[in-house]
Amino acid sequence: MEAGRIDRRRRYTLSVIREAFFALLAEVGFAKMTVADICRRADINRGTFYLHYEDKFALLDALIDEALAAAPPLEGTETGALCQRPPANDDYYLLYLDDDAYARVAQRVVERSAEQMVPSIMEESGLSREDAYLLFVHNVQGNLAVNRLLGWKRGPKFAHAQELLVAYSEGGLRAISSRHDSRSSS
């Protein structure tokens, strides 16, 4: 019985921290937000915050991971598909709109997805792991930047941009692959 109460309190605390974070992200942005601001908004003390998170960056990383986990599952191994999944709810959109938070979103997408995507690029192109990783990072950063520019709004413009990016990526991989094949056969 006591464990259920503690778990309920913990869930409540994490919930008010999360709500305070997203409210402040919308109002002042990540760079200007402090742990003290989050605690004031959540009506908790700093000690309580630090029981759950090391700092505001750890909170941001946890919320980014939550947002990525809430997105529809990734089908296939195309980098474009990875970056076409819109945020699952309005709070998560804020992570993509804030300049400082967005940089960490892109970093986390790369960290969480490289293991799945880089071997696929290597197989398709014949590139080394290092070179395939460079292409993967380029594709993630570029796709996310274009989606951000378009406001993640679905529609004809978004669909056209995705088609263009996929054609560009696939054409580039074909060119690299054929270049690699011609060097191998020489």
Give residue spans per PLM region.
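Alpha-helical structural segments
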Residues: 15-23, 27, 41, 58-81, ...
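Acidic-glycine-rich active-site phosphate/pyrophosphate-binding loop
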Residues: 113-123
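Hydrophobic/aromatic-rich alpha-helical bundle segments in the mid-to-C-terminal region
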Residues: 121-186
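Hydrophobic alpha-helical connector segments
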Residues: 72-103
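Helix-turn-helix
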Residues: 24-56
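Basic, helix-initiating cap at the start of DNA-binding domains
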Residues: 1-28, 37
